[in-house]
Amino acid sequence: YRRDAEAFLAALEDEAYRHFSGLKPVCDFTVIYERSPDLFTASSVAELDRLYAEARGDEKRRLAYLLAFAVDGYMGAETRQLGDEVANTENRTTITVDGEEIGLRAAPVAMANEPDRARRQRIEEARLAATAEHLNPLLGAQWRRCHELARGLGRKDYLDLYSEVRGIDYMALRAKAETFLHDTAALYERTIDRLARERLGLS
C-alpha cells in the first residue's frame, strides 16, 4: 500500500506542477486516480477509521497519519472530475479590462504590477465577477459533494470529519484567530500607515 501510495502522490504532484506552471494546458487528475482504483475506497477508509478508533498510543498516532492520507485521497478520488473542471475552467477563463484580455490566473500578477489604483480596482472587480460566474458554481458543487462524503463516513459534515482526522479543533482555532486579529487591528493599521508613508511615499 505504501509503495502504491508513494507512486500515486508522485504522479499527482507532477500533474499539478505541470499544469499550474503552464507546461500542460489541460489538467487531468482523473486519469491518475483511475490508475489506482483500489487505493482510496469508502470501505478502506471505513476500515482504517475502525482501526484508528480502537488503537492507542503510538499505533493511534501512526494510524492518524494514514487515515488522514486515505480521507484526502478518497475525497479527491470522488471529486476528481470536478477538480479537473475547476482547474481547466480557471486556466481558460479570461477577463477584459480596458480592452486588454488577461487570463484569470494572471490577474493577481497584473494587479501587483499595475501602478494605477483605478485600473487595479477594475482588474479586481473583473476577476471577482469571472470567479463568481465561472468557478464558484463548480467549487460549490465540489464542496457539497465533500460534505456528502463526510456524512457517508459517519460524520456530521466535512468540518467534523477533518477536525477528527487532523486532530485540530477548527472552531477553537477560528476563535483564537479572530481574537488575535481584533487585538492587533490598531497596531496593524498604524504599522501599515507608517510603512506606506516611509517606503511607498503614500499619504
Where do the PLM segments sit?
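Contiguous, non-catalytic segments that form substrate-binding/exosite surfaces or channel walls
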Residues: 83, 90, 129-203
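N-terminal helix-rich structural modules
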Residues: 1-133, 140, 159, 179
